[in-house]
Regions:
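Short Trp-Ser/Thr-centered turn/loop motifs at beta-strand boundaries
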Residues: 172, 177-208
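Short, solvent-exposed loop/turn segments enriched in Ser/Thr/Gly
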Residues: 21-28, 200
């Protein structure tokens, strides 16, 4: 399995890419199944992760991590609450009624509505990949502050400056120990394998411009 950021900017090569500071930036990438196996993989197509580097929480399972490097060193990301950047979630949170209907349909035994919500979120992130198939995604991001359309939680702050050269990379981590809990909604079968593990994309150099 591979994540690849394509050279789809016709006007300039990857080595000269400029990204606008505080402007919406479209980041596109492909997920490629190089194997001869059918796979199910958890990945969110609406936004990147809102949590700090290396963190994988059940609610954010399947949210790819947008990472920035300076001279080969991973830059820190900080979380905070900035009201003017909140409220960007692409789809509204389900109501309690919708969650209870989801619980009944999927025969879940949880009493805590938060647990049901986690399963509901995960169920919307499941995609399939046939052998040799490529799926493409395009997500918007803003720098240095980012609030993910996949969540309405804390805002991320990337420690980046204008007119300096950086690299960005997309990282996806699906820990094997987390997957078993969600097997009832992922629906593994003899045909489909459930992907677990880490995938990292190629690095793309950029300069942040105001």
């Amino acid at each position: 399995m591979e994540i690849k950021i394509p050279d789809d900017f016709k006007e300039f090569p990857l080595s000269d890419r400029e990204l606008g500071s505080y402007k919406k930036i479209k980041i596109c990438y492909d997920i490629i199944n190089h194997s001869n196996e059918y796979y199910k993989i958890i990945i969110d197509s609406t936004g990147f992760s809102n949590v700090e580097n290396e963190a994988v929480d059940e609610l954010y399972l399947g949210l790819a991590d947008f990472r920035i490097y300076e001279n080969g060193i991973l830059k820190n990301k900080q979380t905070g609450n900035l009201p003017y950047t909140r409220g960007t979630r692409k789809y509204p949170f389900p109501t309690n009624k919708e969650l209870l209907q989801f619980k009944k349909k999927n025969e879940l035994n949880f009493k805590d509505i938060y647990d049901i919500r986690i399963f509901h979120e995960i169920s919307k992130r499941i995609i399939t990949l046939a052998p040799k198939e490529t799926r493409s995604f395009c997500l918007d991001i803003t720098l240095p502050f980012y609030n993910s359309p996949a969540d309405d939680g804390a805002t991320l702050y990337f420690e980046v400056e204008n007119d300096k050269r950086y690299d960005y990379q997309i990282h996806l981590n699906i820990p094997k120990q987390m997957i078993h809990r969600f097997s009832s909604i992922i629906g593994g079968s003899k045909k489909y394998k459930i992907f677990t593990g880490e995938i990292v994309s190629n690095k793309v150099p950029f300069i942040l411009k105001r």
